[in-house]
Swiss-Prot record:
Organism field: Brucella canis (strain ATCC 23365 / NCTC 10854 / RM-666)
Transmembrane segments: none
Lineage start: Bacteria, Pseudomonadati, Pseudomonadota, Alphaproteobacteria, Hyphomicrobiales
Assembly notes: Homodimer.
GO MF annotation list: adenine binding; adenine phosphoribosyltransferase activity; AMP binding
Name of the protein in its database record: Adenine phosphoribosyltransferase
Xref: PROSITE patterns: PUR_PYR_PR_TRANSFER
Presence of keyword Cell membrane: no
Reaction(s) the record says it catalyses: AMP + diphosphate = 5-phospho-alpha-D-ribose 1-diphosphate + adenine
Subcellular location: Cytoplasm
Length: 181
């Protein structure tokens, strides 16, 4: 059942060649999210290892991590914490800078969103180079969170993002891998 399940999820993800630039195979997870059965199965599969455990918060990375994280938080009876691009949150925030392919950006969360020692699952739709997820994890750790896991629907293993999170000592859970492109 496991391998058939992964094929089903993989088939629900649209691949758009040469987007946003030539040579890139863009993995469009919105087609999976738009398919009720596939979205439900993805959420259930990401929730399963943590059901019955104490999870205080689910932190979702802007923007598709909000969609996925909200559903996971609901299933785990946990709170939801948005991790956003700089300047999008209205109250006192904590911020971290991280490197992009062509520069630096910042993400932030509300200063009071996490209490020290809270058990958190970090969520986004996809992990590629891992820069954004690594910055989000460091921000949560800086706030005193205990990160139980980092979860993604899609892994692009050739880009090495998973290894960055594992180097921080974080368990990483993904459902579908697209290798070699």
């Amino acid at each position: 059942m496991e391998s058939g399940f992964k094929v089903t999820l993989k088939d629900a993800i649209r691949t758009i060649p040469d987007y946003p630039k030539p040579g890139v195979q863009f993995r469009d997870v919105t087609t999976l999210m738009g398919n009720a059965q596939a979205f439900r199965r993805a959420v259930d599969e990401l929730v399963y290892p943590y059901a019955g455990n104490r999870i205080d918060k689910v932190a979702g990375i802007e923007a598709r991590g909000f969609i996925l994280g909200g559903a996971i938080a609901h299933q785990l009876s946990a709170g939801f914490v948005p991790i956003r691009k700089k300047g999008k949150l209205p109250r006192d925030t904590v911020r971290i800078a991280y490197s992009l392919e062509y520069g630096v950006d910042e993400m932030e969360m509300h200063r009071d969103a996490i209490e020290k020692g809270e058990r958190v699952v970090l969520v986004d739709d996809l992990i590629a180079t891992g820069g954004t997820a690594e910055a989000a994890a460091k921000l949560l750790l800086q706030m005193g969170a205990e990160i139980v896991a980092a979860c993604f629907i899609i892994d692009l293993p050739d880009l090495g993002g998973r290894k960055k999170l594992e180097a921080l000592g974080l368990p990483v859970r993904t459902l579908v891998a697209f290798e070699g492109d």
